[in-house]
UniProtKB/Swiss-Prot annotation:
<dbReference type="InterPro" id="IPR010978">
    <property type="entry name" value="tRNA-bd_arm"/>
</dbReference>
<dbReference type="GO" id="GO:0004828">
    <property type="term" value="F:serine-tRNA ligase activity"/>
</dbReference>
<feature type="binding site">
    <location>
        <begin position="347"/>
        <end position="350"/>
    </location>
    <ligand>
        <name>ATP</name>
    </ligand>
</feature>
<dbReference type="InterPro" id="IPR002317">
    <property type="entry name" value="Ser-tRNA-ligase_type_1"/>
</dbReference>
<keyword id="KW-0547">Nucleotide-binding</keyword>
<dbReference type="InterPro" id="IPR033729">
    <property type="entry name" value="SerRS_core"/>
</dbReference>
<protein>
    <recommendedName>
        <fullName>Serine--tRNA ligase</fullName>
        <ecNumber>6.1.1.11</ecNumber>
    </recommendedName>
</protein>
<keyword id="KW-0648">Protein biosynthesis</keyword>
<dbReference type="GO" id="GO:0016260">
    <property type="term" value="P:selenocysteine biosynthetic process"/>
</dbReference>
<dbReference type="GO" id="GO:0005524">
    <property type="term" value="F:ATP binding"/>
</dbReference>
<feature type="binding site">
    <location>
        <position position="383"/>
    </location>
    <ligand>
        <name>L-serine</name>
    </ligand>
</feature>
<keyword id="KW-0963">Cytoplasm</keyword>
<dbReference type="InterPro" id="IPR042103">
    <property type="entry name" value="SerRS_1_N_sf"/>
</dbReference>
<comment type="function">
    <text>Catalyzes the attachment of serine to tRNA(Ser). Is also able to aminoacylate tRNA(Sec) with serine, to form the misacylated tRNA L-seryl-tRNA(Sec), which will be further converted into selenocysteinyl-tRNA(Sec).</text>
</comment>
<keyword id="KW-0030">Aminoacyl-tRNA synthetase</keyword>
<comment type="similarity">
    <text>Belongs to the class-II aminoacyl-tRNA synthetase family. Type-1 seryl-tRNA synthetase subfamily.</text>
</comment>
<feature type="binding site">
    <location>
        <begin position="229"/>
        <end position="231"/>
    </location>
    <ligand>
        <name>L-serine</name>
    </ligand>
</feature>
Protein backbone atom coordinates (compact mmCIF):
# COMPACT_ATOMS: atom_id res chain seq x y z
CA UNK A 1 0.00 0.00 0.00
CA UNK A 2 1.28 3.46 -0.86
CA UNK A 3 1.79 6.23 1.68
CA UNK A 4 -1.29 8.48 1.76
CA UNK A 5 1.00 11.45 2.46
CA UNK A 6 2.79 10.82 -0.84
CA UNK A 7 -0.54 10.73 -2.67
CA UNK A 8 -1.69 13.97 -0.99
CA UNK A 9 1.55 15.85 -1.59
CA UNK A 10 2.55 14.52 -5.04
CA UNK A 11 -0.57 13.21 -6.79
CA UNK A 12 0.66 14.09 -10.28
CA UNK A 13 3.98 12.31 -9.74
CA UNK A 14 2.19 9.22 -8.41
CA UNK A 15 -0.04 9.23 -11.50
CA UNK A 16 3.01 9.59 -13.74
CA UNK A 17 4.71 6.60 -12.13
CA UNK A 18 1.53 4.51 -12.36
CA UNK A 19 1.24 5.44 -16.03
CA UNK A 20 4.72 3.94 -16.57
CA UNK A 21 3.14 0.63 -15.55
CA UNK A 22 0.08 1.15 -17.74
CA UNK A 23 -2.20 1.99 -14.80
CA UNK A 24 -4.92 4.65 -15.05
CA UNK A 25 -4.33 7.38 -12.47
CA UNK A 26 -8.07 7.97 -11.96
CA UNK A 27 -7.96 5.86 -8.80
CA UNK A 28 -5.67 8.48 -7.25
CA UNK A 29 -8.44 11.06 -7.72
CA UNK A 30 -10.85 8.65 -6.00
CA UNK A 31 -8.49 8.23 -3.05
CA UNK A 32 -8.08 12.00 -2.73
CA UNK A 33 -11.85 12.51 -2.88
CA UNK A 34 -12.32 9.98 -0.07
CA UNK A 35 -9.48 11.65 1.82
CA UNK A 36 -11.17 15.04 1.57
CA UNK A 37 -14.46 13.57 2.81
CA UNK A 38 -12.63 11.83 5.65
CA UNK A 39 -10.90 15.00 6.82
CA UNK A 40 -14.13 16.99 6.61
CA UNK A 41 -15.96 14.38 8.70
CA UNK A 42 -13.15 14.29 11.26
CA UNK A 43 -13.41 18.08 11.57
CA UNK A 44 -17.18 17.89 12.02
CA UNK A 45 -16.89 15.13 14.64
CA UNK A 46 -14.29 17.08 16.58
CA UNK A 47 -16.39 20.26 16.35
CA UNK A 48 -19.50 18.47 17.69
CA UNK A 49 -17.49 16.89 20.50
CA UNK A 50 -16.13 20.29 21.48
CA UNK A 51 -19.70 21.67 21.52
CA UNK A 52 -20.86 18.74 23.65
CA UNK A 53 -18.04 19.29 26.13
CA UNK A 54 -18.91 22.98 26.37
CA UNK A 55 -22.60 22.17 26.95
CA UNK A 56 -21.64 19.62 29.60
CA UNK A 57 -19.70 22.25 31.51
CA UNK A 58 -22.64 24.67 31.27
CA UNK A 59 -25.04 22.09 32.68
CA UNK A 60 -22.91 21.68 35.77
CA UNK A 61 -23.24 25.37 36.58
CA UNK A 62 -27.00 25.70 35.86
CA UNK A 63 -29.59 25.95 38.58
CA UNK A 64 -32.67 26.60 36.44
CA UNK A 65 -34.22 23.18 35.81
CA UNK A 66 -35.85 24.12 32.48
CA UNK A 67 -32.60 25.49 31.07
CA UNK A 68 -30.75 22.48 32.40
CA UNK A 69 -33.19 20.11 30.68
CA UNK A 70 -32.86 22.03 27.40
CA UNK A 71 -29.09 21.70 27.52
CA UNK A 72 -29.35 17.98 28.29
CA UNK A 73 -31.57 17.60 25.23
CA UNK A 74 -29.03 19.57 23.17
CA UNK A 75 -26.30 17.20 24.39
CA UNK A 76 -28.41 14.22 23.36
CA UNK A 77 -28.88 15.66 19.87
CA UNK A 78 -25.15 16.32 19.60
CA UNK A 79 -24.48 12.74 20.68
CA UNK A 80 -26.79 11.44 17.96
CA UNK A 81 -25.09 13.66 15.38
CA UNK A 82 -21.65 12.46 16.49
CA UNK A 83 -22.75 8.83 16.23
CA UNK A 84 -24.05 9.40 12.69
CA UNK A 85 -20.88 11.26 11.67
CA UNK A 86 -18.75 8.45 13.14
CA UNK A 87 -20.74 5.95 11.07
CA UNK A 88 -20.17 8.02 7.92
CA UNK A 89 -16.48 8.40 8.80
CA UNK A 90 -16.02 4.65 9.22
CA UNK A 91 -17.68 4.03 5.85
CA UNK A 92 -15.51 6.60 4.07
CA UNK A 93 -12.34 5.25 5.72
CA UNK A 94 -13.25 1.76 4.56
CA UNK A 95 -13.86 3.03 1.01
CA UNK A 96 -10.56 4.89 1.03
CA UNK A 97 -8.64 1.85 2.31
CA UNK A 98 -10.29 -0.39 -0.28
CA UNK A 99 -9.22 2.01 -3.02
CA UNK A 100 -5.69 2.23 -1.59
CA UNK A 101 -5.40 -1.55 -1.61
CA UNK A 102 -6.15 -1.59 -5.35
CA UNK A 103 -3.16 0.64 -6.17
CA UNK A 104 0.02 -1.12 -7.27
CA UNK A 105 3.50 -0.13 -6.07
CA UNK A 106 5.52 2.50 -7.95
CA UNK A 107 8.49 1.49 -10.11
CA UNK A 108 12.04 2.42 -9.10
CA UNK A 109 13.78 4.95 -11.41
CA UNK A 110 16.20 2.22 -12.54
CA UNK A 111 13.37 0.10 -13.95
CA UNK A 112 13.23 0.35 -17.76
CA UNK A 113 9.97 1.41 -19.37
CA UNK A 114 8.35 -1.21 -21.56
CA UNK A 115 5.14 -2.48 -23.12
CA UNK A 116 5.60 -6.22 -22.50
CA UNK A 117 8.09 -8.90 -21.38
CA UNK A 118 10.17 -8.41 -24.52
CA UNK A 119 11.37 -5.11 -23.04
CA UNK A 120 12.98 -6.84 -20.05
CA UNK A 121 16.76 -6.34 -20.04
CA UNK A 122 19.34 -9.12 -19.63
CA UNK A 123 21.87 -7.75 -17.11
CA UNK A 124 23.93 -10.89 -16.51
CA UNK A 125 24.45 -14.32 -18.04
CA UNK A 126 26.50 -17.44 -17.29
CA UNK A 127 26.48 -20.13 -19.91
CA UNK A 128 24.87 -20.29 -23.32
CA UNK A 129 21.83 -21.95 -24.82
CA UNK A 130 23.42 -25.37 -24.44
CA UNK A 131 23.15 -27.63 -27.46
CA UNK A 132 23.51 -31.34 -26.70
CA UNK A 133 25.51 -33.63 -29.05
CA UNK A 134 22.32 -35.61 -29.68
CA UNK A 135 18.64 -34.66 -30.13
CA UNK A 136 17.50 -33.23 -26.78
CA UNK A 137 14.32 -34.76 -25.40
CA UNK A 138 11.80 -32.75 -23.35
CA UNK A 139 11.48 -33.62 -19.69
CA UNK A 140 8.07 -35.26 -20.05
CA UNK A 141 9.47 -37.80 -22.50
CA UNK A 142 12.48 -38.44 -20.28
CA UNK A 143 10.36 -38.69 -17.15
CA UNK A 144 7.83 -41.11 -18.59
CA UNK A 145 10.50 -43.29 -20.18
CA UNK A 146 12.37 -43.49 -16.85
CA UNK A 147 9.19 -44.09 -14.88
CA UNK A 148 9.72 -41.04 -12.65
CA UNK A 149 6.88 -38.85 -13.95
CA UNK A 150 3.30 -40.15 -14.02
CA UNK A 151 0.89 -37.68 -15.60
CA UNK A 152 -1.98 -40.11 -16.04
CA UNK A 153 -2.25 -40.88 -12.33
CA UNK A 154 -1.87 -37.21 -11.42
CA UNK A 155 -4.97 -36.47 -13.48
CA UNK A 156 -6.67 -39.52 -11.98
CA UNK A 157 -6.07 -38.16 -8.47
CA UNK A 158 -6.75 -34.44 -8.88
CA UNK A 159 -7.55 -33.52 -12.47
CA UNK A 160 -5.62 -31.60 -15.10
CA UNK A 161 -2.34 -29.85 -14.27
CA UNK A 162 -1.43 -32.33 -11.53
CA UNK A 163 1.19 -35.05 -11.74
CA UNK A 164 2.86 -37.78 -9.67
CA UNK A 165 6.62 -38.18 -9.20
CA UNK A 166 7.95 -41.67 -8.53
CA UNK A 167 11.12 -43.32 -7.27
CA UNK A 168 14.26 -41.38 -8.16
CA UNK A 169 12.09 -38.52 -9.43
CA UNK A 170 10.47 -38.06 -6.02
CA UNK A 171 13.89 -38.39 -4.38
CA UNK A 172 15.30 -35.74 -6.72
CA UNK A 173 12.49 -33.39 -5.77
CA UNK A 174 13.18 -33.90 -2.06
CA UNK A 175 16.94 -33.58 -2.57
CA UNK A 176 16.62 -30.24 -4.34
CA UNK A 177 14.43 -28.83 -1.55
CA UNK A 178 16.80 -29.93 1.20
CA UNK A 179 19.90 -28.78 -0.67
CA UNK A 180 18.37 -25.35 -1.32
CA UNK A 181 17.45 -24.89 2.34
CA UNK A 182 20.95 -25.93 3.44
CA UNK A 183 22.49 -23.52 0.93
CA UNK A 184 20.36 -20.63 2.18
CA UNK A 185 21.37 -21.48 5.75
CA UNK A 186 25.00 -20.96 4.70
CA UNK A 187 24.00 -17.71 2.98
CA UNK A 188 22.73 -16.33 6.29
CA UNK A 189 19.02 -17.17 6.26
CA UNK A 190 17.07 -18.68 9.13
CA UNK A 191 14.92 -21.61 8.06
CA UNK A 192 11.22 -21.16 8.82
CA UNK A 193 8.46 -23.76 8.68
CA UNK A 194 5.03 -22.16 8.34
CA UNK A 195 1.43 -23.34 8.00
CA UNK A 196 0.43 -24.07 4.41
CA UNK A 197 -2.89 -22.29 5.03
CA UNK A 198 -3.39 -18.70 6.17
CA UNK A 199 -6.11 -16.32 7.29
CA UNK A 200 -7.56 -13.94 4.72
CA UNK A 201 -5.95 -10.97 6.50
CA UNK A 202 -2.50 -12.41 5.76
CA UNK A 203 -3.28 -12.50 2.02
CA UNK A 204 -4.36 -8.86 2.16
CA UNK A 205 -1.17 -7.97 4.02
CA UNK A 206 1.06 -9.62 1.43
CA UNK A 207 -0.76 -8.01 -1.51
CA UNK A 208 -2.28 -11.22 -2.91
CA UNK A 209 -5.74 -9.81 -2.25
CA UNK A 210 -7.70 -8.33 -3.85
CA UNK A 211 -5.84 -8.68 -7.16
CA UNK A 212 -5.33 -12.46 -7.26
CA UNK A 213 -8.51 -13.65 -5.53
CA UNK A 214 -9.63 -15.78 -8.49
CA UNK A 215 -6.31 -17.66 -8.53
CA UNK A 216 -6.43 -18.79 -4.88
CA UNK A 217 -7.87 -21.86 -3.19
CA UNK A 218 -10.12 -21.22 -0.17
CA UNK A 219 -11.76 -23.55 2.33
CA UNK A 220 -15.27 -22.15 2.74
CA UNK A 221 -15.91 -23.76 6.12
CA UNK A 222 -12.82 -22.50 7.94
CA UNK A 223 -12.21 -19.37 5.86
CA UNK A 224 -8.55 -20.38 5.50
CA UNK A 225 -6.68 -20.13 2.21
CA UNK A 226 -3.99 -22.39 0.74
CA UNK A 227 -0.75 -20.46 0.29
CA UNK A 228 0.18 -19.50 -3.29
CA UNK A 229 3.78 -18.89 -2.13
CA UNK A 230 5.73 -18.90 1.15
CA UNK A 231 6.03 -15.14 0.68
CA UNK A 232 2.51 -14.88 2.11
CA UNK A 233 3.03 -16.46 5.56
CA UNK A 234 6.54 -14.98 5.81
CA UNK A 235 5.07 -11.49 5.33
CA UNK A 236 2.55 -12.17 8.08
CA UNK A 237 5.10 -13.37 10.65
CA UNK A 238 5.66 -9.89 12.08
CA UNK A 239 2.31 -8.26 11.23
CA UNK A 240 1.26 -5.59 13.76
CA UNK A 241 4.65 -5.76 15.48
CA UNK A 242 7.34 -3.18 16.20
CA UNK A 243 10.86 -4.52 15.75
CA UNK A 244 14.01 -3.02 17.19
CA UNK A 245 16.70 -1.76 14.82
CA UNK A 246 19.10 -4.27 16.37
CA UNK A 247 16.92 -7.12 15.03
CA UNK A 248 17.38 -6.03 11.42
CA UNK A 249 18.14 -7.32 8.90
CA UNK A 250 16.08 -10.49 9.23
CA UNK A 251 16.63 -13.12 6.53
CA UNK A 252 14.22 -16.06 6.35
CA UNK A 253 14.01 -19.06 4.02
CA UNK A 254 11.02 -21.39 3.85
CA UNK A 255 9.83 -24.32 1.80
CA UNK A 256 6.12 -24.69 1.03
CA UNK A 257 3.99 -26.35 -1.58
CA UNK A 258 2.21 -23.61 -3.53
CA UNK A 259 -1.37 -23.75 -4.79
CA UNK A 260 -2.77 -21.62 -7.61
CA UNK A 261 -5.98 -21.91 -9.62
CA UNK A 262 -4.76 -19.79 -12.52
CA UNK A 263 -6.54 -20.60 -15.75
CA UNK A 264 -4.09 -21.72 -18.41
CA UNK A 265 -4.81 -21.58 -22.12
CA UNK A 266 -5.17 -24.96 -23.80
CA UNK A 267 -2.36 -24.35 -26.26
CA UNK A 268 0.24 -23.04 -23.81
CA UNK A 269 2.61 -25.30 -21.88
CA UNK A 270 0.15 -28.18 -21.93
CA UNK A 271 2.89 -30.81 -21.73
CA UNK A 272 5.05 -31.54 -18.74
CA UNK A 273 5.38 -29.94 -15.31
CA UNK A 274 6.16 -26.33 -16.20
CA UNK A 275 2.75 -25.08 -15.13
CA UNK A 276 0.57 -26.73 -12.52
CA UNK A 277 -1.92 -25.96 -9.81
CA UNK A 278 0.39 -27.38 -7.13
CA UNK A 279 4.16 -26.96 -7.08
CA UNK A 280 7.03 -26.76 -4.60
CA UNK A 281 9.16 -23.69 -3.97
CA UNK A 282 11.79 -22.49 -1.55
CA UNK A 283 11.38 -18.79 -0.76
CA UNK A 284 13.86 -16.23 0.55
CA UNK A 285 12.43 -13.26 2.46
CA UNK A 286 14.04 -10.19 4.04
CA UNK A 287 13.01 -7.52 6.55
CA UNK A 288 15.48 -4.62 6.35
CA UNK A 289 15.97 -0.94 7.15
CA UNK A 290 14.72 1.29 4.31
CA UNK A 291 18.16 2.68 3.52
CA UNK A 292 19.51 -0.86 3.05
CA UNK A 293 16.80 -2.39 0.87
CA UNK A 294 18.41 -1.97 -2.55
CA UNK A 295 21.70 -3.34 -1.27
CA UNK A 296 19.66 -6.25 0.11
CA UNK A 297 18.06 -6.76 -3.32
CA UNK A 298 21.49 -7.33 -4.83
CA UNK A 299 22.26 -9.94 -2.15
CA UNK A 300 18.94 -11.63 -2.87
CA UNK A 301 19.77 -11.72 -6.55
CA UNK A 302 23.28 -13.12 -5.92
CA UNK A 303 21.90 -15.79 -3.60
CA UNK A 304 19.37 -16.93 -6.21
CA UNK A 305 21.99 -16.92 -8.96
CA UNK A 306 24.25 -19.05 -6.76
CA UNK A 307 21.57 -21.75 -6.69
CA UNK A 308 21.61 -22.06 -10.48
CA UNK A 309 25.40 -21.79 -10.64
CA UNK A 310 26.05 -24.61 -8.16
CA UNK A 311 23.54 -26.83 -9.97
CA UNK A 312 25.61 -26.33 -13.12
CA UNK A 313 22.75 -24.79 -15.09
CA UNK A 314 23.19 -22.08 -17.74
CA UNK A 315 21.37 -19.02 -16.40
CA UNK A 316 20.71 -15.39 -17.11
CA UNK A 317 19.34 -12.54 -15.03
CA UNK A 318 16.80 -10.05 -16.36
CA UNK A 319 15.79 -6.67 -14.99
CA UNK A 320 12.04 -6.50 -15.50
CA UNK A 321 10.52 -3.55 -17.32
CA UNK A 322 7.54 -1.58 -16.01
CA UNK A 323 5.03 -3.65 -18.01
CA UNK A 324 6.23 -6.93 -16.47
CA UNK A 325 6.74 -5.68 -12.91
CA UNK A 326 4.66 -7.42 -10.24
CA UNK A 327 1.85 -5.63 -8.40
CA UNK A 328 3.82 -5.05 -5.19
CA UNK A 329 7.30 -4.65 -6.63
CA UNK A 330 9.40 -1.54 -7.18
CA UNK A 331 12.25 -3.45 -8.85
CA UNK A 332 12.54 -7.11 -9.84
CA UNK A 333 15.20 -9.41 -11.21
CA UNK A 334 14.15 -12.69 -12.84
CA UNK A 335 16.65 -15.54 -12.98
CA UNK A 336 16.08 -17.91 -15.89
CA UNK A 337 17.74 -21.26 -16.63
CA UNK A 338 18.16 -22.83 -20.04
CA UNK A 339 16.23 -26.01 -20.79
CA UNK A 340 17.44 -27.59 -24.07
CA UNK A 341 14.63 -30.14 -24.31
CA UNK A 342 11.90 -27.52 -24.59
CA UNK A 343 14.33 -24.96 -26.06
CA UNK A 344 13.37 -22.25 -23.58
CA UNK A 345 14.75 -20.04 -20.83
CA UNK A 346 12.63 -20.88 -17.78
CA UNK A 347 12.11 -18.49 -14.88
CA UNK A 348 13.16 -20.20 -11.64
CA UNK A 349 13.43 -17.13 -9.42
CA UNK A 350 11.92 -13.67 -9.18
CA UNK A 351 13.71 -11.37 -6.70
CA UNK A 352 11.82 -8.21 -5.74
CA UNK A 353 12.12 -5.20 -3.48
CA UNK A 354 8.64 -4.07 -2.44
CA UNK A 355 9.97 -1.32 -0.13
CA UNK A 356 7.29 -0.50 2.51
CA UNK A 357 4.38 -1.69 0.33
CA UNK A 358 3.73 -4.92 2.26
CA UNK A 359 4.91 -3.56 5.61
CA UNK A 360 2.33 -0.77 5.43
CA UNK A 361 -0.44 -3.26 4.65
CA UNK A 362 0.76 -5.63 7.41
CA UNK A 363 1.72 -2.84 9.84
CA UNK A 364 5.30 -4.06 10.34
CA UNK A 365 7.44 -1.33 11.86
CA UNK A 366 10.77 -0.85 13.60
CA UNK A 367 12.35 1.76 15.87
CA UNK A 368 15.40 3.37 14.21
CA UNK A 369 16.76 3.97 17.72
CA UNK A 370 15.48 3.47 21.29
CA UNK A 371 12.50 5.72 22.00
CA UNK A 372 12.20 6.86 18.38
CA UNK A 373 8.93 6.94 16.47
CA UNK A 374 8.38 3.60 14.68
CA UNK A 375 8.83 3.50 10.90
CA UNK A 376 7.84 0.89 8.34
CA UNK A 377 10.45 -1.70 7.43
CA UNK A 378 11.22 -2.62 3.84
CA UNK A 379 10.59 -6.20 2.72
CA UNK A 380 12.05 -8.23 -0.13
CA UNK A 381 11.24 -11.66 -1.51
CA UNK A 382 12.80 -14.07 -3.95
CA UNK A 383 12.36 -17.63 -5.10
CA UNK A 384 15.29 -19.77 -4.19
CA UNK A 385 14.21 -21.68 -6.30
CA UNK A 386 10.91 -22.71 -7.88
CA UNK A 387 11.13 -26.48 -8.20
CA UNK A 388 9.18 -27.62 -11.25
CA UNK A 389 11.27 -25.54 -13.63
CA UNK A 390 14.49 -26.29 -11.74
CA UNK A 391 13.70 -30.00 -12.06
CA UNK A 392 12.96 -29.51 -15.78
CA UNK A 393 16.32 -27.80 -16.29
CA UNK A 394 18.20 -30.52 -14.38
CA UNK A 395 16.51 -33.31 -16.35
CA UNK A 396 17.01 -31.67 -19.74
CA UNK A 397 20.58 -30.39 -19.22
CA UNK A 398 21.85 -33.57 -17.58
CA UNK A 399 20.12 -36.04 -19.92
CA UNK A 400 22.30 -38.60 -21.66
CA UNK A 401 21.94 -40.11 -25.11
CA UNK A 402 20.76 -43.40 -23.59
CA UNK A 403 17.87 -41.59 -21.84
CA UNK A 404 19.40 -41.64 -18.37
CA UNK A 405 19.91 -38.46 -16.34
CA UNK A 406 23.09 -37.59 -14.47
CA UNK A 407 22.52 -36.11 -11.03
CA UNK A 408 24.29 -32.78 -10.33
CA UNK A 409 27.22 -33.37 -7.98
CA UNK A 410 25.86 -31.09 -5.24
CA UNK A 411 22.70 -33.22 -5.03
CA UNK A 412 24.33 -36.64 -4.88
CA UNK A 413 24.90 -36.62 -1.08
CA UNK A 414 21.16 -35.94 -0.71
CA UNK A 415 20.33 -38.98 -2.86
CA UNK A 416 22.44 -41.55 -1.06
CA UNK A 417 25.34 -41.15 -3.49
CA UNK A 418 23.22 -41.91 -6.57
CA UNK A 419 24.97 -40.58 -9.68
CA UNK A 420 22.49 -41.35 -12.43
CA UNK A 421 18.76 -41.88 -12.83
CA UNK A 422 17.99 -44.92 -14.95
CA UNK A 423 14.84 -46.87 -15.65
CA UNK A 424 14.71 -49.17 -12.66
CA UNK A 425 12.26 -51.46 -14.44
CA UNK A 426 14.49 -51.91 -17.47
Amino acid sequence: MLDIKLIREQPDEVKRQLARCGVDGAIIDQVLAFDEQRRRLIYEVETRKAERNAVSKQIGAMKDQAERQAKIEAMRRLGDEIAELDRQLAAVEEQQRAAMLEIRNLPHPDVPDGVDEHDNVVVYQEGEERQLPFPARPHWELGEALGILDFERGVKLAGSRFYVMRGAGARLQRAVIQWLLDLHLRQGYQEIYTPFVVKESVLWASGQLPKFRDNLYRDEESGLWLVPTAEVPLTGLYADEILEASQLPIYHAAYTPCFRKEQLSAGRDVRGIKRGHQFDKVEMYMFVKPEESYQALEKLRRDAEECARLLGLPFRTKLLCTADLGFGSTKTYDIEVWAPGVGEWLEVSSCSNVEAFQARRANIRYRPEPGAKPEFVHTLNGSGLGLPRTIIAIMENYQQEDGSILIPEVLRPYMGGMERIVNEAA
